[in-house]
Amino acid sequence: MDIKLINIGFGNIVSAHRVIAIVSPESSPIKRIITEAREKGQLIDATYGRRTRAVIIADSGHVILSAIQPETVANRFLLSRDVHDSSSSPC
């Protein structure tokens, strides 16, 4: 099994197969999820003090904050999948 890693900014990397959702932090339900994760000790702040622009929800229940746009994280996620798909196909 290949491990796919996604760069979420500032040298921080998450495992692609653990990601459930990549969302914007603007809505009230997402803000509530962030608050609950902070209280449970399951919040990982990878923003380096910058504004949170993407919230990544992992299958372990961890919530990861990133300073890059959700679209950018999603594109990196898709690129990591495409690279794997093209490298595994016989030519």
Swiss-Prot record:
Which InterPro entries does the entry mention?
RemA-like (IPR007169)
Per its UniProt entry, which superkingdom is the organism in? Bacteria
- Cysteine disulfide links: none
- Endpoints of the signal sequence: none
Query: What does the similarity note say?
Result: Belongs to the RemA family.
- Protein name listed in UniProt: Putative regulatory protein Cyan7425_4125
User: What species was this sequence derived from?
Assistant: Cyanothece sp. (strain PCC 7425 / ATCC 29141)
Species lineage = Bacteria, Bacillati, Cyanobacteriota, Cyanophyceae, Gomontiellales
